[in-house]
Amino acid sequence: MHPIAQANGLRVHVFEEGYVRPHWLTLEKHGVNGRSQLPRDPAWYRDQRRVTPPGPPGQPTGYNLYERAFHDIRYRGANTFFATRFPHYRSHRPRNGFFEYSGLAARALRQRQHHRDSDQVTRELLDAGRAYYIFPLQLNSDAQIVVHSPFDSVREAIAKVLTSFASHAPADSWLVIKNHPLDTGLIDYRRHAEQLARELGMAERLRFIDAGHLPTLLDHARGAVVVNSTVGLSALHHRRPLIALGTAIYGMPGLTWQGSLDDFWLHAEAPDMHLYQAFLDYVVHHTQINGDFYTRSGIAMATAGAVRRLEAATHA
C-alpha cells in the first residue's frame, strides 16, 4: 500500500486501537506499532518535553464489550453471507469466525470460575507477600505477534519466557501468566504452560489466570514481561521494571530493559518516570484520538478528532 500511495503523491495515515487505554484510538502517519515512525531515542523525548504540554485525560467514550461484539458478529455474518461474491478475500484470522465464537462462548461460560480463580491467586500472592513477575499474553493472530515479534506464535513466546524463568529467576519468585481477555480459548495455553512448567521443574512456581484485576497485579509485581503489548505502558505507569521481547514503540533505554531476558529477572531496574511522562505526553498529543471504533458516541468523538488531526497534517 505504501509504495502505491507514494507513487501517487499520497500520504498514508493508519488507524489502530489506542496505544493508551482506555478512551483512546491511534491515528498515526505512515504506520503503527512496529511500523511507527516514533523515535526510540530517550534524549529526543526529553527535549520535546519543553514544547509538549501534559497530555489531556481521555474522556469516556461509552465503550462497552457488547457493542464491540455486536459489530464483530455483523462483520462475520457479512463475510459469510457474501463469501461467494468475494472468493479471493482472505482474513487475517486463522479460523472461521463462528468457530471462534464457539470457543468464546465456552470461555464465557467459565468466566465466573475464572474470576474466582484469579481472585484466589491474587490473594495468595498478596497475603504472602510473594515476589512474582507477570507475563500478559497477546492474541495469537495479532500482527504484533505475527509481524512485529521474533515469535511465530504465543506458545513459542510462553516457552521462551518459562525456560528463561526456570533457569535464571530468583528461586523464591513466581511467574503469573495472564491470558488475553479476548482470547478465543481454542488454543489451551494453560495446559501448554503447565505441562512445560512440569518439564522444567517449576510447576509450583507458575500461576496461570484467565481473568484478574491487572492494575493490582502490576502494582505489586517485581517486574513485567511482554512481547509488545499495550500492557507495557500500564506496567510503566505502575513503575514496574519491564522487558519487551518484540518491537514496541516504548522499547528504549530508560523505559525497558535493554539486556537479555535471562538477565532481566535479577538486574532490571524501574523505569525513568520523567522519561515515561515525556514519552506519554508526546504520544497522546501526536498519535492518539479520544474516541472508539464501536459506539455512536465514541465514533462521533473519534471522527471530530481525526478531522482535526488530518487537517493539521495537510497544512503542516
Each predicted region: which residue ranges?
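A donor-sugar binding/catalytic signature common to diverse glycosyltransferases
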Residues: 1, 12, 16, 210-256
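Secretory-pathway glycan-assembly enzymes, especially type II membrane glycosyltransferases
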Residues: 1-119, 123-130, 136
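Anion (oxyanion) recognition and catalysis
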Residues: 2, 6, 169, 236
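Short, solvent-exposed loop/turn segments at secondary-structure junctions
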Residues: 18-21, 32, 138-142, 181-183, ...
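Short, hinge-like loop/turn segments at secondary-structure boundaries
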Residues: 30-33, 193-195, 243-244, 261-262
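Leloir-type glycosyltransferase catalytic cores
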Residues: 36-83, 255-316
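Conserved catalytic-core segment of nucleotide-activated headgroup transferases in glycan assembly
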Residues: 86-192
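Nucleotide-activated donor-binding/catalytic signature segment of Leloir-type glycosyltransferases, i.e.
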Residues: 191-209
